[in-house]
């Protein structure tokens, strides 16, 4: 294999694929990236066995071929080469090293056979829809903070992407929950989305797909099967296994009849929560909300650090009550509100609270209260 490629094209493609490679691997080949040179393209592939990212770039191919090389080392070398450099990559069977040359720089990297590199099959990915990139970014950004990190409840370790039909309108919906809070975002379903299987996309896959969307075009092609999901971003593509499990019936926990409705300045409220939470205990981070007409009083008590109290003006004219929440969960939800105001819908201190964004009715958040 022998080729020349511009540093910018090489760095972009390597940046897309190398992040899927774990820093520590018990299987040596998984630390490597597969380089395939053919025609006028150099293609790149990286995998952790659950997910695969591929990309390609134009190159001058003198001798076609395939080889694998250490992903992170190769990326760091190319990243540190000067802008505008032409990079030469070469490998021959006589010397088990990938030779990298640019200007007066020369590097030799150990390689492993391309035939040992695992390739993820894309069989069964029959459902394909084109999703507006900005809308897909919105679905992910509005929900992924609520994905669970507890491995014991593995079926919550991802984003549940599916279609629903409400009032005769089909919507593409994303839901995440960790049992303490729930985030839901939806958009009108793209053409062809009706009937696609609902899948739980793993947390790491969501993070990688979101990163690739930064340089995607106007649409992302999404292919779904009950076992896999594939995102296509032009030349780059991400294929991943989905979580084999049943996502809980989340509609049962979304309040429908919470009658105590409160509207507040989202930014002022978030800053107040952040201030009083400074002295909260790290484990619970609980904050008490004393709600009464016209105001909320936020209180945090910590036996060791003291007490914090702050009042915030609100639009509320119902009966007074007190309720507690995890401060971090409150801040996470406030951080997703697009408009200047947030609307909280309460039932009682022991029941879930619904938070909605008046300027984006396609998102909903549910917070479970704490005992304070």
Curated annotation (Swiss-Prot):
Gene3D superfamilies: DNA Polymerase III, subunit A, domain 2
Keyword Repressor: no
Keyword DNA damage part of the UniProt annotation: no
A cellular component term, taken from the record's GO annotations: cytoplasm
Compartments reported by the entry: Cytoplasm
This protein's UniProt keywords: Cytoplasm, DNA replication, DNA-binding, DNA-directed DNA polymerase, Nucleotidyltransferase, Transferase
One Gene Ontology MF term: DNA binding
Subunit structure: Forms a ring-shaped head-to-tail homodimer around DNA which binds and tethers DNA polymerases and other proteins to the DNA. The DNA replisome complex has a single clamp-loading complex (3 tau and 1 each of delta, delta', psi and chi subunits) which binds 3 Pol III cores (1 core on the leading strand and 2 on the lagging strand) each with a beta sliding clamp dimer. Additional proteins in the replisome are other copies of gamma, psi and chi, Ssb, DNA helicase and RNA primase.
InterPro entries: DNA_clamp_sf, DNA_polIII_beta, DNA_polIII_beta_C, DNA_polIII_beta_cen, DNA_polIII_beta_N
Name of the protein this chain belongs to: Beta sliding clamp
UniProt record, GO biological process: DNA strand elongation involved in DNA replication
Predominant cellular place of this UniProt entry's protein: cytoplasm
Function: Confers DNA tethering and processivity to DNA polymerases and other proteins. Acts as a clamp, forming a ring around DNA (a reaction catalyzed by the clamp-loading complex) which diffuses in an ATP-independent manner freely and bidirectionally along dsDNA. Initially characterized for its ability to contact the catalytic subunit of DNA polymerase III (Pol III), a complex, multichain enzyme responsible for most of the replicative synthesis in bacteria; Pol III exhibits 3'-5' exonuclease proofreading activity.
Similarity comment text for this entry: Belongs to the beta sliding clamp family.
């Amino acid at each position: 294999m022998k080729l020349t490629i511009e540093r910018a094209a090489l760095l972009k493609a390597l940046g897309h694929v190398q992040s899927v490679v774990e820093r520590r691997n018990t299987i040596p080949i998984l630390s490597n990236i597969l380089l395939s040179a053919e025609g006028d393209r150099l293609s790149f592939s990286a995998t952790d066995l659950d997910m695969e990212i591929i990309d390609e770039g134009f190159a001058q191919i003198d001798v076609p071929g395939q080889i694998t090389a250490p992903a992170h080392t190769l990326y760091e070398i190319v990243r540190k080469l000067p802008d505008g450099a032409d990079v030469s990559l070469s490998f021959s069977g006589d010397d088990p090293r990938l030779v990298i040359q640019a200007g007066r720089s020369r590097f030799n990297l150990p390689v492993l056979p391309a035939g040992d590199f695992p390739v993820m099959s894309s069989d069964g990915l029959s459902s394909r829809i084109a999703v507006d990139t900005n809308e897909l970014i919105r679905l992910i950004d509005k929900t992924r903070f609520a994905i669970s990190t507890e491995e014991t409840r593995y079926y919550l370790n991802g984003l549940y992407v599916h279609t629903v039909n409400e009032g005769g309108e089909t919507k593409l919906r994303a839901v995440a929950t960790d049992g303490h809070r729930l985030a839901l975002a939806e958009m009108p379903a793209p053409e062809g989305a009706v009937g696609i299987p609902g899948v739980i996309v793993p947390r790491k896959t969501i993070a990688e797909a979101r990163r690739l969307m930064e340089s995607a075009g106007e649409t992302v092609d999404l292919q779904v099967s009950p076992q896999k999901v594939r995102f296509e971003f032009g030349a780059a593509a991400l294929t991943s296994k989905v979580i084999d499990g049943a996502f809980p019936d989340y509609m049962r926990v979304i309040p429908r009849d919470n009658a105590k409705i409160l509207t507040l300045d989202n930014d002022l409220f978030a800053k107040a929560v952040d201030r009083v939470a400074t002295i909260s205990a790290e484990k619970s981070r609980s904050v008490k909300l004393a709600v009464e007409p016209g105001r909320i009083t936020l209180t945090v008590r910590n036996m060791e650090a003291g007490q914090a109290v702050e009042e915030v003006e609100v639009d509320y004219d119902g009966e007074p009550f007190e309720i507690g929440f995890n401060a971090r969960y409150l801040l996470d939800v406030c951080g997703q509100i697009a408009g200047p105001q947030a609307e909280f819908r309460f039932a009682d201190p022991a029941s879930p609270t619904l938070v909605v964004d008046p300027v984006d009715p396609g998102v909903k958040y549910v917070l479970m209260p704490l005992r304070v």
